[in-house]
């Protein structure tokens, strides 16, 4: 974090006509030391577990091991000795053998960076002036990109109960190339709602949204409005998150969803004082609405399901974190990148785990829910147990019952659990769904009314 602040200061010293190294300035940062410590503790605990899993993967696959040491001065026996005993990874091997990661914690209401980790923290790996993966790494996001797919569909008039077929499809890239996307577990199904598709991170539903409801270019436009600086390619595979993102930027984008659709640029400095104690510069993040509050609320509500009963539910049943929360798991093809980003009304935390060489798999079972989520879960649990944090000059008190309030324009409707049409009070098994007031379903459930009529006859 300190290195990130130094680089930020170097960007502004010429504009302020100051010398950050000689003028005796006092720099006030956004960091909360307690949150930073919690992030470091959770990161170190779980990154070592991920390292041990990767070591075993290499040991179980001699071909993978041989390919990874090509061009190095190490022979296979030397590397096997290192991995078998979980020894420190030598510098020459770290690009392919060392599990790395990044964490960013942000106050979504003002953009203050509360904590940051840009790589391994152990003494033998720590490089204070090196590559900060939180702010510099460009990695495939996988399924954590899917909220941009779904919110684009919501903005185009579709709803949480819009149904698409959870079946394989073939997409022709050109005359000779076909793409056959699959769900991560190879499963298929019948008509599936958008809410369920996001909750279970079904690739086939995400792909069909892009094929049948919206276009890749619409998704790119939406994602770029959240200030993602990397190139997002308008291709069919955008549905599965194939274009690189930077951890701090995608975490900040999730902060928009936590903050009623309003974007705050991440900031690391609150103000600067000269040697006489005079404030010479204050930093305030500009607030920009990038998605309508009501549409954002529906997106938020769908992402809460990910935590309550979807791919992120381990936070509930294993880690016993019960505060209102939303988020998304992410895993890339071949498990090269594992992500989890989660948020409450007060804080958003993004976690990325991977190897610097993006061709190296973390392991066959290293999904985002396995490799990244535990880092988040331990951190958020400890932060809420602590009960508060400092954000600029304010103390934010954490309430594990504080939830997001529905804005104007949101309507609750009883729908049939089977047909997803308006429920008949007496004959349908119903549930409550939320809609924008101008997209309320108009069709009544005919299946159960007709069945009742037939029964009477």
Model-inferred region functions:
Residues 132-175, 309, 381:
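Active-site rim segments in enzyme catalytic domains, especially the processed small/beta chain
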Residues 124, 128, 139, 154, ...:
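Proteins synthesized as precursors that undergo proteolytic processing into mature forms
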Residues 1-50, 57-64, 209-211, 221-225, ...:
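Non-catalytic, structured segments within soluble enzyme domains
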Residues 29, 33-52, 56-107, 115-117, ...:
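A penicillin-recognizing enzyme superfamily signal
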Residues 6, 10, 14, 40, ...:
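Sec-exported extracytoplasmic/periplasmic mature domains
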Residues 158-219, 263, 275-305:
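Conserved catalytic neighborhood of penicillin-recognizing serine enzymes
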Residues 176-183, 213-252, 261, 266-268:
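Mid-domain, small-residue-enriched loop/turn segments at the edges of structured enzyme/sensor domains
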